[in-house]
Amino acid sequence: MKLHEYQARDILARYGVPVTGGGVATTPAEARAIAEQIGGRVVVKAQVFVGGRGKAGGVKLADTPEQAEQVAGQILGMNIKGLTVEKVLVAEAITYEREIYLGAIMDRASRRIVMMASAEGGVEIEEVARTNPEAIVKVAAHPMLGLLDFQARDLAYGIGLTDAKQARQFAQIATALYRAYMDVDASLAEINPLVVRADGSLQALDSKIVLDDSGLFRHPDLEAMRDASDEPEAEQRAREAGITYIKLDGDIGCMVNGAGLAMATMDVIKLYGGEPANFLDIGGGASKEKVKTALQIILSDPNVKAVMFNIFGGITRVDEVAKGIVAALSEVQTNVPMIARLVGTNEEEGRRILAESALIPAATLAEAAEKAVHAARAG
C-alpha cells in the first residue's frame, strides 16, 4: 500500500526527521490558508501515486498566499498520467546547496534491511543505479541489533559528509528512517531529496513510504490512510475480494491458484511467445463467487485477447472453480477464448461441468500455454 507524500512526511516527522512546514489542502482556499500560516514562499505539490509530477505541471512555486491559491486551483483536478489530483501539499520552499538520497529497502538476497545513500539526490535511485552505481553506498542492518551507529556514520562519510556535526545529523536521520521503516512494516521508505542547507543543516524535502500489505493487520491506523481513489478499480475490487491481482502489459489473462504456480504459468506463457496480461492468485479453497469475481476482473482489461485457467486442486476443489467459471460466463458476455487446465480434487466433475461450456480444454500446462498464445494471436 502506497502512502502519499504528505502522509509519509508526517510519519517521518514523528521519528525526528526534519521536514519543512506545511499541510495538505483539498481546495484553493485551504491552500491559501496554509500559505498564510507558513509565510513567505511555498511549493504546491500534487498528491498522486505517480512519478514525474513536476514535468506534468503538478509542482509549482508561489510567492504569496494569493499565488498559492491560484496555483492550487490549477493543480487540483489536473489529470496526471490517468490520475486526478484531489489533494495538494503546500510546504515551505527553501533554498539549499546540495541534494542527497537516503532510503531503506528489503534486500531479499541477503535477507537484510539495506540502507542506501547517494550523493546524487533528487533523481530516481534506479537511474543512479543504472548510470553510476558507484555513487550508491549501502549498509545492511543487523536483523537483531538494527542499524548501528557506525553504519549510519559510514553512510554519511561514503557520500562525502565529512563535517562531524553534519555527519552526526545525517546518522540521526538515517536511524530515524530505519526505525520508521521497521515500525510501520514498510517495504520501502526513502527521502529524496534530503538537502543540505547553506548553514550545513539537513532537511527532508520529499519522502516516500510503501507499506507491506501483509503487515497492515497490525496497523489499522495506517490502513485507514489508504486512498482508494488512486488505486485502479480492478485492483481495489480484487483486494476487497481477497484476490491477489497485478495488471501487466500483455494480452493473455491468467487465473491460477497459488503464487508459485501463477509465476510458473506466466513463465511458460512467455516461453511459448506470449505475454501475460496479469498476475492473479485466487488462493486456496477458492469459492464459486471468488472465481466469478476473478474472471470479471480479468475481463475488465480491454487488452485481454485470451484467458488461461491453471488450477491445481489440493485445498481448492476443481468442481467449485468450474462452477465459478460457468457462472461468470453466464453473466459476462464475451467472445474472448478461454483455455482451461484443471487437475486435482474432483477434477472429473470439474471437467464434466466445463465440457458443457465453450472452454478449450488442456491436459498439461505446456498445452494450455500453447493454446492460449495461439488464441491471443488469432484474436
UniProtKB/Swiss-Prot annotation:
Q: Which residues form the ATP-grasp domain?
A: 9-237
Q: GO BP, one example?
A: tricarboxylic acid cycle
Matching entries from InterPro entries are given as:
ATP-grasp, ATP-grasp_succ-CoA_synth-type, ATP_grasp_subdomain_1, Succ-CoA_synthase_bsu_CS, SUCC_ACL_C, Succ_CoA_ligase-like_bsu, Succinyl-CoA_synth-like
- Matching PROSITE patterns, A to Z? ATP_GRASP (PS50975), SUCCINYL_COA_LIG_3 (PS01217)
Coiled-coil spans in chain: none
Q: Which GO terms describe its molecular function?
A: ATP binding; magnesium ion binding; succinate-CoA ligase (ADP-forming) activity; succinate-CoA ligase (GDP-forming) activity
Instruction: Write out the residues that bind ATP.
Output: 45, 52-54, 94, 99
Any single GO CC term annotated in Swiss-Prot or TrEMBL for this entry:
succinate-CoA ligase complex
Binding positions (Mg(2+)): 192, 206
Enzyme Commission (EC) number: 6.2.1.5
Pathway linked to the protein: Carbohydrate metabolism; tricarboxylic acid cycle; succinate from succinyl-CoA (ligase route): step 1/1
- What is catalyzed by this enzyme? succinate + ATP + CoA = succinyl-CoA + ADP + phosphate; GTP + succinate + CoA = succinyl-CoA + GDP + phosphate
Cofactor binding comment, as recorded: Binds 1 Mg(2+) ion per subunit.
Which EC class does it fall in?
ligase
User: Which co-factors does it depend on?
Assistant: Mg(2+)
Entry-linked Pfam families:
ATP-grasp_2 (PF08442), Ligase_CoA (PF00549)
Spans traversing the lipid bilayer: none
* Known partners and oligomeric status: Heterotetramer of two alpha and two beta subunits.
Family (UniProt): Belongs to the succinate/malate CoA ligase beta subunit family.
Functional note:
Succinyl-CoA synthetase functions in the citric acid cycle (TCA), coupling the hydrolysis of succinyl-CoA to the synthesis of either ATP or GTP and thus represents the only step of substrate-level phosphorylation in the TCA. The beta subunit provides nucleotide specificity of the enzyme and binds the substrate succinate, while the binding sites for coenzyme A and phosphate are found in the alpha subunit.
Tell me the NCBIfam families matching this sequence.
Answer: PRK00696.1, sucCoAbeta
- For this entry, the protein name equals Succinate--CoA ligase [ADP-forming] subunit beta
Q: Which organism is it from?
A: Roseiflexus castenholzii (strain DSM 13941 / HLO8)
